[in-house]
Amino acid sequence: MGALVAIVGRPNVGKSTLFNRLTQSRQAIVAEEAGTTRDRQYGRVHWNGREFSIVDTGGWVVNSEDVFEEEINKQVYIAVEEADVVLFVADNQTGVTSLDEQVAEILRRSKKPVIVVANKVDNTEDHYSASEFYSFGLGDPYCIAAVSGSGTGDLLDRVMELLPAENGQSDLDETLPRIAIVGRPNAGKSSLLNAFIGEDRHIVTDIAGTTRDSIYTKYNKFGLNFYLVDTAGIRKRGKVNEDLEYYSVIRSIRAIENSDVCVLMLDATRGVESQDLNIFQIIQRNSKGLVVCINKWDLVEDKSQAVIKTFENAIRQRFAPFTDFPLLFISAMTKQRIFKVLETVNQVYAHRSTRIPTHKLNEVMLPIIEATPPPATKGKYIKIKYVMQLPTAVPSFAFFANLPQWVKEPYKRFLENQIRAHWDFCGTPINIFIREK
């Protein structure tokens, strides 16, 4: 885990199409509904037995279809600072533009591995015209057609060559939770970090020659042992302003991927915003434990139970269908309920390793399934005969049925909700698999 590839380039060169091709995503990338575009900004790529994360940096830029030099520069600086490999996408149909040259100049000055991707190369003649991208001074251009997938295999092979070697066996104590504190800028991440670990946070700031792998710092606070997950770049200021919202999302990726439990900080004075949903989505996609903290609760005047209930309902509604997570109202500045945060993180971590005996699972679940069976499909009745928990890091359950292919997503959610109703998995995702008996 932890290798990160960023896609950069001016608008309309095919970055999103390439992203969808590499992640094998089938989502409509032009959907306008709120929340529908966030899936295309972050994904996982599997190639030749290895896996890495990929981000389309343009996905977090508001109005990214407008060609603003400043916004393009920000994207490129983010990629240079955070990614292991940068894919610089250019449009072979339009050729080199002044904006392309500006991006290339920034990339040349960096020491980051860069692959020039000449997109929309559909035939032999196009291959010849792609030679003009040598003018970037960034090595051989890789000719692809993102729409059809032509050339992407060679591109991925090259990405594999440039990615840093995977780490060997970890020296971490696997019995201790790895905590990542994530959230939008100014939501209170630094204040909570300081409340947890005080002034020693600067002791581990500078590690010469460090890669972009996550840093694990072990702490003991309030009698609880834990690791705080950080990334090499997160404590230093780069050329990109720290308060850029999409920058904070990209910086969260490594910490999330290398954690067990994520503390998602929300600002009580602002509620749930689009970047909160982006970060939540990444936590979900990586099947991490979740504790949601409503910070700056000291600034809210009306703290009545009615207001608290309204806050809770609004937040769970925004994060649906996953709503079974602890939600704490805190103030990192005044240290209100700080111990409760760590205590809850440890509880969520324990829930991830909950094991239910098979006989008990069947004793509870089979009568429920018999009373509310899966809907019949094409006149055929679906019968679930048996259920067992799988030996996985994330709680996972296999239900054995005669026609597993006809069990739809709503019924899987029903099964998950029944498991949650009978056993405490608060804060941790559950995977439901339907297999043939």
UniProtKB/Swiss-Prot annotation:
GO terms for molecular function: GTP binding; ribosome binding. Keywords: GTP-binding, Nucleotide-binding, Repeat, Ribosome biogenesis. PROSITE patterns: G_ENGA (PS51712). GTP 1 binds at residues 9-16, 56-60, 119-122. SUPFAM superfamilies: P-loop containing nucleoside triphosphate hydrolases (SSF52540). It holds the Pfam family KH_dom-like. One of its GO terms (biological process) is ribosome biogenesis. CDD domains: EngA1, EngA2. GTP 2 binds at residues 183-190, 230-234, 295-298. Gene3D superfamilies: 3.30.300.20, P-loop containing nucleotide triphosphate hydrolases. InterPro entries: G_ENGA (IPR031166), GTP-bd (IPR006073), GTPase_Der (IPR016484), KH_dom-like (IPR032859), KH_dom-like_a/b (IPR015946), P-loop_NTPase (IPR027417), Small_GTP-bd (IPR005225). Residues 3-167, 177-353 form the EngA-type G domain. Residues 354-437 form the KH-like domain. GTPase that plays an essential role in the late steps of ribosome biogenesis. Associates with the 50S ribosomal subunit. Belongs to the TRAFAC class TrmE-Era-EngA-EngB-Septin-like GTPase superfamily. EngA (Der) GTPase family. HAMAP family: GTPase_Der. This is GTPase Der. It comes from Porphyromonas gingivalis (strain ATCC BAA-308 / W83).
